[in-house]
């Protein structure tokens, strides 16, 4: 007849639990990591070690092929990297207080840390394992004592303490270490889930230490990966420019804490909350990606996809083709747009989920005020021919109170730009300084056009704060506005990003700035970035406000005199690229034709060309030099 129902919990029936000592778990985890390296990688790693069973901080520099005889990879940076790898190498028992005593990194610790740096740990744990928390713990300042407090309280011998461990499949007596390690469900181990009982909220990271780590990752991010020799050459070259990358790493860290100051970093601390919110908000994959590159460029390069000879062969065949193919001008750095700048901006774009890639190979300089003149007409002739996305970069010094009170050109602009702050108010927040250099960049997805009546653009436009701190302002999704946030007004009102069309009729000129907007006046001399979150204006809102924790609810402005303005074209692929090449080639032919005209004897015609911004007199108007 009927059968008796079972009272055994199905989950309980499935779970297989076994106890291991700390030493046993560490050994098994090492073997699990070792199984994730290819035999050839292990062989090359041992070869690089020359029979050594442990390495020092200096040895690490050689293993990672860091350049020697340079001040860039200082002893401090290598020591930071060593300390991080030492702690991660102790995994899963990372709440270890004896690290300061140990001066070498064992082979086992090296293997474990390489697995985490390379991202292969994802094959061991669930996809939600928090690598950033582990990195923060490894970088943090912690009191160094000889014994763990937890063990002292329990009066347990650390060598005999047992840890309950879930198994996927029961262990067999004849199982080798690698197989035993594979049978453990590491994600369910309590010591892994709570990071070995680490009270992360009580920890902090020294700001200078985090800056060094960030600078190293920016350099690694800048390297274009073609082949091993090219990688090494770039690593040496960019390492010599450590100070340039270091400046941008400070800007990035100011997204974590806006109060960080260059000359106080050694004594400033970053809490876990600031680190977690800031990094996850701006650079969620930055450290993992670039530590992976560091490992794959050197020790585990056999697993790194490299561009090979076929690329060169393709170039050779192209040269032998009778038809001459147009090539764009080779990238040359400017005062603002440099290799460190591109690495910095690319890291930001990648972090906020923007697919745009910025590199020396896909950028063409269309306009630079220092070369073509600070003229709206000159700007128009240079950028309107580009039928692909562009990057606008505008930079200068923050306007000082004295300049605002005495400069007549600024006062004329100020009359047209409606004030939000009262004249009697201190217009600077406590994290803004009069000596700041201000730089903003705008990614414009659509081609430029004259827009004296209606805005243009789409929701892929984005405003980036470059200096003195990193920030971003994405387009608002709206079926009504449709991202049409940009105007190029050649009738005396300049450029606007996030503004409504300016009023310009019956001798009345007035800007209508949005609450999140960047306005550049017609002489390309002054600019204002406005960030208002407590405004009651009825103006359209084209861009989201800052998500930075200190700033997201603050009203502020950056008013600055422009010393540099540049527009760079982005090279796209496919049909658009071919059309752009044809357009560029036609423009070059027209330019050559103009050069053949004897403009010295043109008289009135020369004056006309000057007004059009095509020849001469570019420096006569606009731009604060």
From Swiss-Prot:
It holds the Pfam family TLD. GO terms for cellular component: cytoplasm. Its main location: cytoplasm. It is found in: Cytoplasm. Residues 305-327 are annotated as: Disordered. Residues 335-571 form the TLDc domain. Keywords: Cytoplasm. InterPro entries: TLDc_dom. Belongs to the RTC5 family. May be involved in a process influencing telomere capping. This is Restriction of telomere capping protein 5. It comes from Candida tropicalis (strain ATCC MYA-3404 / T1).
